[in-house]
Swiss-Prot record:
GO terms for molecular function: ATP binding; hydroxyethylthiazole kinase activity; magnesium ion binding. Pathway: Cofactor biosynthesis; thiamine diphosphate biosynthesis; 4-methyl-5-(2-phosphoethyl)-thiazole from 5-(2-hydroxyethyl)-4-methylthiazole: step 1/1. It holds the Pfam family HK. Its EC number is 2.7.1.50. Substrate binds at M44, G193. One of its GO terms (biological process) is thiamine biosynthetic process. CDD domains: THZ_kinase. This is Hydroxyethylthiazole kinase. Belongs to the Thz kinase family.
Length: 262
């Protein structure tokens, strides 16, 4: 599997795919730096006027509803329509789905047309049960709780969707294939924007891998392994953030192999 990961990263760094990000303002800087570290070329757009052109230039479209308002909703819906027309993959992070009515409704609309969806267990469960309430961006549920919902959602999506349920344990499925991943480090949950950036990395991997399940699986594994390597070098979240970017960039597969083969 490390060989597949290496090949995908080499393609990323050779092709430098453009990823259009329609995302939140909280994690935008860190997200852009993660894209650059792995070799992708991010565009962070906030204008409806250039959507058609930018999606035409992009290899994937990343939607993240972290900072939601009516203008963002209109922009994201229009981006989906254009991306479908241009046959571009849509990678979606349903931040806060299940927390408020509007977030849940927007998430349901965007889910139907997504190529990859990534969220913690509570966000994924909110798609299957409108009565579920979540705690902002945090999850009160475990990955195991969300497995059946994730498989059902993957089978219901219109675009052959892969669902990535992430947390202490990660679960990836496209409805037919599934993978459980036990990598990463608890310190990753103490850095704002880490989940948003993980979804961005999945968008980058999907831009060079046509199989959404494989793109999600390899992206989650690479991101998690980089977190483990960064944790070796620090004790707290401040330095961790910097070292994590270094590890994304370094792609030290010799060090990764120690964790991957345990």
């Amino acid at each position: 599997m490390l060989e597949q990961m290496y090949e995908a990263l080499q393609r990323l760094r050779k092709e430098k795919p453009v990823i259009l990000n329609i995302t939140n303002y909280v994690s935008m800087d860190f997200l852009a730096n993660c894209f650059l570290a792995i070799g992708a070329s991010p565009i962070m757009s906030v204008s409806d006027l250039e959507l058609e052109e930018l999606i035409g230039l992009s290899s994937a479209v990343y939607l993240n509803i972290g900072t939601l308002d009516h203008l963002f909703i209109q922009r994201s819906y229009r981006a989906v329509d254009i991306a479908i027309r241009q046959n571009k993959p849509i990678i979606f992070d349903p931040v806060g789905s299940g927390t408020t009515k509007i977030r849940t409704e927007v998430s349901h609309h965007l889910l139907a047309h997504s190529t990859i969806v990534r969220g913690n267990a509570s966000k994924i469960l909110s798609f299957g049960d409108l009565s579920i309430k979540t705690r902002g961006v945090d999850s009160a549920n475990t990955t195991h709780d969300a497995k059946e919902t994730a498989i059902a959602l993957a089978n219901e999506c219109l675009c052959g969707c892969a669902i990535a349920v992430t947390g202490a344990v990660d679960f990836i499925t496209d409805g037919k294939r599934s993978a459980t991943i036990e990598l990463g480090d608890p310190l990753m949950s103490h850095v704002t924007g880490m989940g948003c950036s993980l979804t961005g990395v999945l968008a980058a991997f999907r831009s060079v891998i046509d199989d959404s399940f494989e793109a999600a699986r390899l992206g989650v594994e690479y991101f998690s392994l980089c977190g483990m390597l960064a944790r070796e070098r620090c004790e707290g979240p401040g330095l961790f953030k910097a070292y994590f970017l270094d590890e994304l960039y370094a792609a030290d597969f010799d060090r990764m192999r120690r964790y991957y083969e345990q």
